[in-house]
């Protein structure tokens, strides 16, 4: 089947959606589908940054053809990325089906217009975030309400199939007025990371003196990082050797995080590592962390939690979005309310002081939770959806 995947960004741009699309594209290509990825030249949107010139704008990666089109956007809270020439690129691909990712983006409207004219089915993976969880102030939130009601809802209605990653995501879409077409529940999968080099440790490489709490993800406003800092402070007083390690590209919050670190007097107790491209070092960080924390305001799924669990690391995560559908509270980790620094502290102290608990939760996550989520299973389900919407 001739398939086109349309995400806003694609690796080496960091992010969960980016990895998601890469994993399904490479596996679909391995199954002899003709796969193209039409994406932008963006490394990140907030702050706006393009990929370096060394990243080819047209190439073949893992059997999938990747074209990176020029992106542009309005400034500030009017931010809304556009693909330059996406309609023409779709026409040139002559696809049998288009799979577009992230509902609140211009590529959905362009894909719908192309699909209408070419009589081609299209499916949408929403990667939905409710209005209250997105970055920006009141103007951006008002614009998002207008977009959802007047523009996005009619677009979603016309998709041949809407793919959600959790039942909670489906519920939120319905609650926010989206007239859903056929819906398929397809949670993402986990792909084993490259193992660390023998004899190399994350702590030694970066000079981290003792046990550490780990966060991996974009430094963005919806990730709950300020409550994490506040919740970590009592642990740092309880254990003077404890460090909080934050790995991830700046999503607009780094300056605020640095200010809050200073206000809380945490200084060298928090390490801002930025984005680490070497997967082996990130794998080592997951492996060595005493606990992984994802205190987000919202996550459609929370793929990074699977990565932590796969390394046998217990997790603390917000009881939001799709997270409670796969992280069992008290079995693989602890679920807490979002935006609750005291709950972060309580969960950290519970896990920090109990090696047997860490071992038990880590073992359950690695041996019981993670095997339920594989990318091959995801692609099996996608192929079923694709065949049904394309028809005989």
Task: Name these PLM-found stretches.
Residues 41, 168, 189:
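Carbohydrate-associated surface elements
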């Amino acid at each position: 089947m001739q398939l086109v995947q349309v995400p806003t960004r694609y690796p080496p741009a960091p992010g969960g959606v980016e990895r998601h699309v890469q994993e399904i594209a490479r596996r679909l290509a391995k199954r002899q589908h003709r796969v193209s990825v039409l994406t932008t030249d963006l490394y990140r949107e907030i702050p706006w940054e393009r990929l370096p010139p060394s990243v080819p704008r047209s190439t073949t990666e893992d059997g999938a053809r990747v074209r990176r089109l020029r992106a542009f956007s309005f400034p500030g809270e009017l931010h809304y990325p556009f693909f330059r020439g996406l309609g023409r690129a779709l026409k040139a691909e002559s696809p049998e089906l288009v799979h577009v990712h992230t509902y609140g983006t211009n590529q959905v409207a362009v894909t719908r217009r192309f699909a209408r004219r070419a009589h081609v089915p299209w499916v949408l993976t929403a990667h939905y975030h409710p209005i209250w969880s997105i970055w920006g102030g009141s103007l951006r939130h008002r614009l998002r309400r207008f977009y959802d009601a007047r523009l996005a809802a009619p677009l979603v209605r016309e998709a041949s199939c809407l793919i959600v990653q959790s039942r909670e995501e489906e519920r939120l879409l319905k609650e926010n007025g989206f007239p859903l077409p056929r819906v398929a529940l397809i949670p993402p999968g986990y792909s084993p990371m490259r193992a660390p080099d023998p004899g190399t440790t994350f702590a030694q490489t970066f000079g981290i003196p003792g046990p550490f709490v780990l966060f991996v993800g974009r430094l963005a406003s919806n990730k709950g990082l300020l409550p994490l800092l506040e919740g970590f402070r009592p642990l740092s007083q309880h254990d003077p050797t404890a460090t909080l390690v934050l790995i991830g590209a700046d999503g607009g919050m780094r300056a605020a995080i640095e200010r809050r670190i200073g206000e809380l007097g945490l200084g060298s107790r928090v390490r801002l590592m930025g984005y680490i491209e070497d997967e082996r070092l990130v794998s080592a960080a997951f492996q060595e962390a005493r606990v992984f924390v994802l205190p987000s305001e919202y996550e459609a799924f929370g793929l990074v939690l699977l990565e932590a669990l796969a390394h046998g690391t217990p997790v603390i995560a917000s009881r939001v979005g799709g997270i409670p559908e796969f992280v069992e509270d008290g079995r693989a980790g602890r679920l807490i309310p979002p935006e609750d620094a005291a709950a972060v502290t309580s969960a950290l102290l519970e896990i920090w002081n109990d090696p047997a608990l860490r071992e038990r939760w880590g073992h359950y996550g690695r041996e019981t939770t993670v095997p339920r989520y594989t990318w091959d299973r995801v692609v099996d389900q996608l192929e079923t959806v694709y065949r049904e919407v394309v028809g005989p």
